[in-house]
């Protein structure tokens, strides 16, 4: 099935809600403090990530949509760190600074993959004048296609009813990720997206899908909602709308590593898709696919257009398609648990031709999964000259990922993939051409790990260089 992604670049979305900064301090611990019976952590790594409503905005921006973020912060280093991090990923911030309050910050101390303690720096924003938030919403309504209200019960949405009315009066759909059991405050929203536990906290325990539908439809009527999307973890999602049959979508997640931030991804993709002009049903389809991707990543994550495109055509939803190196390592580990043989090859693959396709198909037949490592643009230029590559890296990877024979596509910056191969250690390393096995980059590492190295022949008469020469000759003629 050919599925076209929404035109995210024309979508404008405003996110209003509780913004926060997630700080992580990592380090080893090998002794107990003499001052108290607690471990001593020698901090060697510090990470800062936007959280709460800020993570929703990041998810929208990662799709290529225009994301604006409004929230309450203090006047402190955390607010500055948030603004910088978000600007780096093309989120336009318009924070309301509150000098009497700190920016909400959650500091986690971790050692050996264990969280030892979390320290929260926050004061409720409930008493803060909401008028500056309303003004920012009003100013943006003419240029956005959706408004997301991200509620973490920290006070930024104390006037949520007024915000809903402002948007609905302007004809802008309002999507809300709810918090708590008082859904009365969300009356009149276009769409609520509670997870199953949040939903059941309001309507009671549901033993069957029929009960979810019955109680969900009553909730829609009681609070004058246009729709309700219940996210149900491994059971997928259920979209309920008045006058329409329930739409139940099974989960697309093959491997679940971390559900952190999955709800932010869902509402972000929903909003961006609606703002691009797609229907609510289509938005749920893309959001479900995106959720299947993001839960396969570690930590709070976003989904790129390439990942989403792979997911909706049935590849990335099972951990396949264009990947980062870290994602590939996780996918390979999962494949090995399933007893699958992993084959790996590499090349520039600038202008894909019949020789490439035949070679990759033959390589795939030698195992259960095929990895194709692709030279970056800079690497290609160093190897092939200033006129190459003809096609940029992203396009080369998309084309390769579309081949049925190819399971995973990853890029590398170096002249050879030796470091990458040493990190992956495939069961079989394959290279096309006139090489001797010992001349192939990564062969020593693969052999040392008990793997195999094999040289395959390319199809005669097929060459990217020859194709380029013919094009140049035709232009001259």
UniProtKB/Swiss-Prot annotation:
Give residues annotated as binding ATP: 195-198
Catalysed reactions, semicolon-separated: D-glycero-beta-D-manno-heptose 7-phosphate + ATP = D-glycero-beta-D-manno-heptose 1,7-bisphosphate + ADP + H(+); D-glycero-beta-D-manno-heptose 1-phosphate + ATP + H(+) = ADP-D-glycero-beta-D-manno-heptose + diphosphate
Against Pfam families, the record matches this protein to:
CTP_transf_like, PfkB
Outcome of swapping residue 264 to E: Loss of activity
Pathway linked to the protein: Nucleotide-sugar biosynthesis; ADP-L-glycero-beta-D-manno-heptose biosynthesis; ADP-L-glycero-beta-D-manno-heptose from D-glycero-beta-D-manno-heptose 7-phosphate: step 1/4; Nucleotide-sugar biosynthesis; ADP-L-glycero-beta-D-manno-heptose biosynthesis; ADP-L-glycero-beta-D-manno-heptose from D-glycero-beta-D-manno-heptose 7-phosphate: step 3/4; Bacterial outer membrane biogenesis; LPS core biosynthesis
Quote the cellular component terms of the Gene Ontology held in the record: cytosol
The protein's matches in Gene3D superfamilies, at most eight in alphabetical order, are given as: 3.40.1190.20, HUPs
Extract the PROSITE patterns matched here: PFKB_KINASES_1
Q: What segment(s) does the record annotate as region Cytidylyltransferase? A: 344-477
Q: Which residues carry this modification: N6-acetyllysine?
A: 179
One of its GO biological process terms is: ADP-L-glycero-beta-D-manno-heptose biosynthetic process
Region Ribokinase: start-end pairs: 1-318
Give the recorded effect for residue 264 to N. Loss of activity
What does the record give under GO molecular function?
ATP binding; heptose 7-phosphate kinase activity; heptose-1-phosphate adenylyltransferase activity; phosphotransferase activity, alcohol group as acceptor; protein homodimerization activity
Q: Which UniProt keywords apply?
A: Acetylation, ATP-binding, Carbohydrate metabolism, Kinase, Lipopolysaccharide biosynthesis, Multifunctional enzyme, Nucleotide-binding, Nucleotidyltransferase, Transferase
Q: Which family does it belong to?
A: In the N-terminal section; belongs to the carbohydrate kinase PfkB family. In the C-terminal section; belongs to the cytidylyltransferase family.
Provide the function of this protein. Catalyzes the ADP transfer from ATP to D-glycero-beta-D-manno-heptose 1-phosphate, yielding ADP-D-glycero-beta-D-manno-heptose.
User: What remark does the entry add?
Assistant: In both reactions the enzyme functions only with beta anomers. The function of the domain II is independent from the activity mediated by domain I.
Report quaternary structure and partners.
Homodimer.
Q: Which HAMAP family match?
A: HldE (MF_01603)
Instruction: Indicate what this protein is called per its UniProt record.
Output: Bifunctional protein HldE
């Amino acid at each position: 099935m050919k599925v076209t992604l929404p035109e995210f670049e024309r979508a404008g979305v405003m996110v209003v809600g509780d913004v926060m900064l997630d700080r992580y301090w990592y380090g080893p611990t090998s002794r107990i403090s003499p001052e108290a019976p607690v471990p001593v952590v020698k901090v060697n790594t510090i990470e800062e990530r936007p959280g709460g409503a800020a993570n929703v905005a990041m998810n929208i921006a990662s799709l290529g949509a225009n994301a604006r973020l409004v929230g309450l912060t203090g006047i402190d280093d955390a607010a500055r760190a948030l603004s910088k991090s978000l600007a780096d990923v093309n989120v336009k911030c318009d924070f309301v600074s509150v000098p009497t309050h700190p920016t909400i910050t959650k500091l986690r101390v971790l050692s050996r993959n264990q969280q030892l303690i979390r320290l929260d720096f926050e004061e409720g924003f409930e008493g803060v004048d909401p008028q500056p938030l309303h003004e920012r919403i009003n100013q943006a309504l003419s240029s956005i296609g959706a408004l997301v209200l991200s509620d973490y019960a920290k006070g930024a949405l104390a006037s949520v009813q007024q915000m809903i009315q402002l948007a609905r009066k302007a004809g802008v759909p309002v999507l809300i990720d709810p918090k708590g059991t008082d859904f009365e405050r969300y009356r009149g929203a276009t769409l609520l997206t509670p997870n199953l536990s949040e939903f059941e906290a309001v309507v009671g325990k549901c033993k069957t899908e029929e009960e979810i539908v019955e109680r969900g439809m009553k909730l829609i009527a009681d609070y004058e909602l246009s729709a309700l999307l219940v996210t149900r973890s491994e059971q997928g999602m259920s979209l309920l709308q008045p006058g329409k049959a329930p739409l139940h979508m099974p989960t697309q997640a093959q491997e679940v590593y971390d559900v952190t931030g999955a709800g932010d991804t869902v509402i972000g993709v929903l909003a961006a898709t609606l703002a691009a002009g797609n229907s609510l049903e289509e938005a749920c389809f893309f959001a479900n696919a995106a959720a299947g991707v993001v839960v396969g990543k570690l930590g709070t994550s976003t989904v790129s257009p390439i990942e989403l495109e792979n997911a909706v055509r049935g590849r990335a939803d099972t951990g396949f398609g264009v990947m980062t190196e870290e994602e590939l390592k996780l996918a390979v580990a999962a494949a090995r648990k399933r007893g699958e043989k992993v084959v790996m090859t590499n090349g520039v693959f600038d202008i894909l031709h019949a020789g490439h396709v035949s070679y990759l198909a033959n390589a795939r037949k030698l195992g259960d999964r095929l990895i194709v490592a692709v030279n970056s643009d800079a690497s290609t230029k160093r190897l092939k000259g200033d006129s190459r590559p003809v096609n940029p890296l992203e396009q080369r990877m998309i084309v390769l990922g579309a081949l049925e024979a190819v399971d995973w596509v990853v890029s590398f910056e170096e002249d050879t993939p030796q470091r990458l191969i040493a990190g992956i250690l495939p069961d079989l390393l394959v290279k096309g051409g006139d090489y001797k096995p010992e001349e192939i980059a990564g062969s020593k590492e693969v052999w040392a790990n008990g793997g195999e190295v094999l040289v395959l022949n390319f199809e005669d008469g097929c060459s990217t260089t020859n194709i380029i020469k013919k094009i140049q000759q035709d232009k001259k003629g």
